[in-house]
Amino acid sequence: GYMGCRTRVIGNVVDEDKAVTPGRGNLSFTSINLPRLGIKHGIVRNDETDMKGFYEELGELMDLVKDQLLERFEIQCNKRLYNFPFLLGQGVWIDSDKLKPNDRLRKILKHGTLSIGFIGLAECLKALIGKHHGESEEAQKLGLEIIEFMRNRCDEYAKEYKLNFTLLATPAEGLSGRFINIDKAVYGKIKGVTDREYYTNSF
């Protein structure tokens, strides 16, 4: 899908004059399963919470997702205008009216967003420190720190590649159900973490 309903398009890195939401879609996004990282580095399975290990692995995962998004972006860019007559013929995308049918799509797709999604912040916090952001001030603070860490990394990618990398809370009940079933199989039932139908996807 080209549009993610929750994509908050935050300023167009590529071209300041074109910082408008219409005309840019969400090119693709991949979600990070935060509860799994929380379980691996948190108090639920260890003597103490290892935030250093948590952030290291989160950073590595984000780099993997970034590479995957870039790879997909390159594939999309190598398509030509005639592959998408409706989307582009209607002038839906910024600059699409300037392309000829045989032009590659990079010129216009660079205005789109590459989104790194995250799921299950509440369960992640519960696994890390035993409480989620609705239950304690400390958890609330940590939750914001985790989001800020991810947001800053997205901003770094955006600067480095001159593309619109954004962070979004994944609206994916189906996906979060799949994640939780895998984690339940691997780590068993953990109260407040894997003992539910699906991971929450809100802040």
Where does each model-flagged region fall?
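Contiguous, well-ordered alpha-helical segments that form the cores/surfaces of helical PPI scaffolds
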Residues: L114-A127, E148
